[in-house]
Every structure is written in C-alpha cells, then in structure tokens.
Amino acid sequence: MLVVDDESDLELLIKQKFRRKIREGSYEFFFAHNGAEAIQVLQKETNIDLVLSDINMPIMDGLTLLSKISELSPIIKVVMVSAYGDMDNIRIAMNRGAFDFVCKPVNFEDLEVTVEKTIQHVQQLRDTLQAIKENNILRMYVDENVLSFMNRREFESSLMANEVVEATVV
C-alpha cells in the first residue's frame, strides 16, 4: 500500500494505527510526499494494489496522480484522503477514477474499513483476471464443437440424469 501525503505526521499515524497488521505481514506500507515520488515508487514496486493519496501536495497534486495511476495500471485502486471534503473535490476525484474518498481529520476506524473493502475489491479483480486467462488457455485446447455441445441443454440434462443421490431415511 502506498501513502502519498506531504504531511509527515500522517506516516507516523499510519504506522501506529496499522502496526499489528504490519507486524503480521498483512500490510506493507510505502510512503511518498507528492505525486511525482508516488509514480517513481509505483514503477519500482509493482506489487502495490492500493494508494491512499492527499489532494493538495507540491510538485504533483493528488488529482493529477489519480489520472496517471489509471494509465499505469487498471488494477491499482486509489482512495483519496483529503481535508478538501467538499462535494466538488469529491466529484472530481470520483470522476477521475478514485475508488473512495476519506475526509481529514482521518477517522482511523473508517479508514481501516475502507482499506479492507478496497483490498477485497482488488482481490476480486485479480481473481477474475486469472479466471479469464485460464479460460482463454482452455479455449486454445478445446474444439469449438465441444464447447457448443457443452452449452446445450441436452448436455446439462445428461449430467443431471447420471447424478447419483444418496440419502439416509431416519
């Protein structure tokens, strides 16, 4: 997980709040102070799935970073964490692809729920992509006639007809 914020206090707070998950090895955090540093970290650390980013930062702001991340990888999800919680900034962030938005001052219970939800979403995306890859590999080896036969109702009925049901009457 990459945390992008120009306030160094947030790094300390994140490390304190998630220290148990860090010790367990469930979470690994990387930190950057602006969008440009974040891009460098993302190019170097290819296993990052989640970015927590502020909006207002020097060099490259969070909204610009959000646009650049979607160019890097469609899997990486961004949660904006910002004091700019007005509806305009929230709408801009969501329209540029933010997965969620958390307002500062950060409620860490809310942040933890948001992080868990985002990680689950990313895992579902990864599982779906893996299933698609496996299906594509299978399609290379299975004849089209077999696939069309398997999609017919007769095939499903024949499978059900051969099904053995065992039961015990008490």
Regions found by a protein language model. Give the residues of each.
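Regulatory cytosolic signal-relay segments
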Residues: C103-N107, L111-V165
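Acidic catalytic/metal-coordinating carboxylates
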Residues: N34-E37, D61-T64
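Two-component/phosphorelay signaling modules centered on CheY-like receiver
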Residues: S8-F30
